[in-house]
Curated annotation (Swiss-Prot):
It catalyses: [protein]-L-isoaspartate + S-adenosyl-L-methionine = [protein]-L-isoaspartate alpha-methyl ester + S-adenosyl-L-homocysteine. InterPro entries: PCMT, SAM-dependent_MTases_sf. It comes from the Bacteria. It comes from Pseudoalteromonas atlantica (strain T6c / ATCC BAA-1087). Catalyzes the methyl esterification of L-isoaspartyl residues in peptides and proteins that result from spontaneous decomposition of normal L-aspartyl and L-asparaginyl residues. It plays a role in the repair and/or degradation of damaged proteins. It is an enzyme of class 2 (transferase). It is found in: Cytoplasm. This is Protein-L-isoaspartate O-methyltransferase. Its EC number is 2.1.1.77.
């Protein structure tokens, strides 16, 4: 069991005030050392509720949106166990998921970020995470279908490949849009889908095709 820090607990308390209610999510935030996922020059900002640059034109997401998206995944009626993450990035969201799901599968298009994230998972003794260097628009079909899918970059439209990889009752949480972005919650119901718009968000774009 992971141990919380005073700064982590303060951040979790702030997120609770911002509307995050799932106790498991708040505990995961409190127990995850966010400074581990940041460049040295930005570690003093680790417990601020803000997105920060991590290099390669990418960011570590605002803790509130990490918690909100995770909470939405866990609110699914099917008690999700296996989750696909599109956009490993720093690995911070990955580490939160690894404390709440039995299995985490994460796809990252930038090899150097994936390498660093994998090292951080080992540092934190989080061994239920599998990583792939690839195009997030394609998902990870050989490991699916998934109970939950979370996308940490904004797609111009919902990728069909990701929707296809959802289990019945599974949820896809994804930011959609270019200049104006909305967080979408899509639930698979048999062969159909229910879609709900949650709130306005701001993410880096989900790039298709190129992996580097």
């Amino acid at each position: 069991m992971r141990v919380s820090s005073r700064k982590g607990e303060s951040l979790a308390h702030l997120l609770k005030q911002e509307g995050i209610v799932n106790a498991s999510v708040l505990n995961a935030v409190a127990c995850t050392p966010r400074e581990l996922f940041l460049p040295d020059a930005l570690r003093h900002k680790a417990y601020q509720n803000t997105a920060l640059p991590i290099g390669q034109g990418q960011t570590i997401s605002q803790p509130y949106i990490v918690a909100k998206m995770t909470e939405l995944l866990l609110a699914s009626s099917n008690a999700p166990k296996a989750v696909l993450e599109i956009g490993t990035g720093s690995g911070y969201q990955t580490a939160i998921l690894a404390q709440l799901f039995d299995k985490v599968f994460s796809v990252e298009r930038i090899k150097s970020l994936q390498f660093q994230a994998k090292r951080r998972m080992n540092q934190l003794d989080l061994h239920n995470v599998s990583m792939k260097h690839g195009d997030g628009w394609q998902g990870w079909s050989s490991k699916g279908p998934f109970d939950a899918i979370i996308v940490t970059a904004a797609a111009s439209q919902v990728p069909a490949k990701l929707v296809e990889q959802l289990n019945d009752g599974g949820r896809l949480i994804i930011p959609v849009g270019e200049q104006s972005q909305q967080l979408h919650c899509i639930t698979r119901v048999g062969e159909g889908f229910n879609e709900q718009i949650i709130e306005a968000v701001r993410f880096v774009p989900l790039v298709a095709g190129d992996i580097i």
